[in-house]
Amino acid sequence: MSKNYQNVKNLKISDELLSFVNKELLKDLDISSEKFWEGFDNAVHDLAPQNKELIQIREKLQKKIDDWHIKNKGNKIEIEQYKKFLSEIGYLKEEGSDFKIETKNVDDEITQIAGPQLVVPIMNARYTLNAANARWVSLYDSLYGTNIIESEEGGSERYDPNRGQEVIKYVREFFDKYIPIDGTSWKNISALKIKDKNLIILKEDKEYKLKDENKFVGHRGDINKPSAIIIKNNNLHFEIIINPKAFSAAHDIAGISDVIAESAVSTICDNEDSVAAVDAEDKVACYRNWLGLMRGDLKVQFEKNGKKLERKLNPDRSYISKEGKGLKLHGRSLLLIRNVGHLMTNSSIILNDGSEVPEGIMDAFITTTAALHDFKKKKNSRTGSIYIVKPVSYTHLTLPTTPYV
């Protein structure tokens, strides 16, 4: 429990949290500390009793279910009988009528792009940055470092050229399957260039095009000697890096040194299961990292193998479209924030009845306020949205949507 508190409205707020909100969270926002805490005070004393009621409903349901299982211990459970029991106690509800989701301003990473989603503890800034930057990763490195590529020899710190060739072979076969060239294979191509707004693949002095020319979307560098080619498949992008001087391109006729794959399109920054935030100091650490992500200035300095390194958010990736115009692709994973559920309370704030604040309500206020910084820049959500992940909840109640701030 926090040691020092300040009285604000009908609240007792820990020094650490109060200082963070007033001096960091609200900085550069058109919300005064007076307005923020007044709104929070009104909201939490309105919603905390409802939160308590939700928990009591859950406890009553759980007790009835526990008692049923004790009573029927050792008996074969008839599914229809069990469903009837769950319906009678109000746990199961009748299916409602069909409806249409009408949510607006949702980013493509949620509506259009199917891809991996990471979950990362928000308390660890370095892990969080790694996850945010996992939008684009080296396919060569990923394959080389996993057992997708079989190897008779065990792992070694030294580079294995045979394994490296197997990686290149795997990627070329992957491209043959999903981004095929019309009339030939990706194996042993000699060069790539752009002509008449199309990707041209050279092999044995012949020119070839992709079977689906729309999969080529852009490039970087000179059209006759591009440094990167951008391919799109199923709304995910691949960046073919061309650098004949690179070590990885030493035995590649076309000078392809790597393939960068669009990977983790979204990431849940977790305030709940993967962290142990038990007091104001812990919660502020979580909130500060989320604020840094929303402001775009989160950085971490660390030492690895005797070298000092700095990790920060990657910038967007810039290219030239096939029409010759500027093209930018999102350089980072779309970040979602997972709030704590109904059950937990936290000593960061004490309410007027002496109880601890419901942690999920505190999370909702502070994480959404932090996201207002991104609304100005739109570097995370391009549509001006914040994505809050809540644990699975069971409730009879419909909570109000009163604008408290």
Language model features: what each stretch is:
Residues S2-K3, K84, E88-L397:
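Catalytic alpha/beta active-site cores
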Residues Q81:
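Short Gly/charged-rich anion-binding patches and loops
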Residues D41, P400-T401:
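Solvent-exposed alpha-helix faces
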Residues H396, T402-V405:
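Single conserved hydrophobic/aromatic residue that forms the stacking wall/gate
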Residues S2-N72, K84-K93:
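N-terminal-proximal low-complexity accessory segments that begin disordered
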